[in-house]
Amino acid sequence: MNPAIYLSCLVVFSLLLLGKVNAEDDDEFRTEKQRLLRVYGDSSVDEATRYRNVDDLVKFYDKYSTLLPWKPDLTQRAQDLLRRYKEETARAVLVDGAPAQGGFWLPLVKLLIVQLGVEIASEGFKRAIES
């Protein structure tokens, strides 16, 4: 096979594959964003559910932070809190594969992340209403 044809086929195939991956990422982004908005934006959701979803919120922010159009101060607060959360979870002592009971900082950081999630969700709803 001619190397030019082979190379062009490879480029086309790569672009198609890349487009499919981006479309899947867009669907995943949209689905997870909606789920987290329901968790943190709905006042009828209990605090325990919000605490259980902190890890999902952290993973979502890590993966999609560049796609989130937040104000600079909100972005900075989120980055600071998530850095602190990761530091505290890295320090957590595991007993038989589960985190040990007690501790002061990790629950406090989780509380701040839950409050930030609620604030971000309300900001998102405000923007949606204004549009």
Swiss-Prot record:
**Major place of localization?**
secreted
Instruction: Please state where this protein is localized.
Output: Secreted
> Could you tell me which Pfam families the record lists for this protein?
Turandot (PF07240)
Which protein family is named in the record? Answer: Belongs to the Turandot family.
Please provide the record's keywords in A-Z order: Immunity, Innate immunity, Secreted, Signal
Which domain of life does this protein belong to? Eukaryota
Q: Quick one: which gene encodes this?
A: TotM
Signal peptide from the UniProt entry: 1-23
Could you tell me what this protein is called? Protein Turandot M
> In UniProt terms, what function does this protein have?
A humoral factor that may play a role in stress tolerance. Requires Mekk1 expression in the fat body to regulate response to septic injury and consequent immune response.
GO CC terms in record: extracellular space
What biological-process terms (Gene Ontology) are attached? cellular response to heat; innate immune response; response to bacterium; response to heat
Q: Give the transmembrane ranges.
A: none
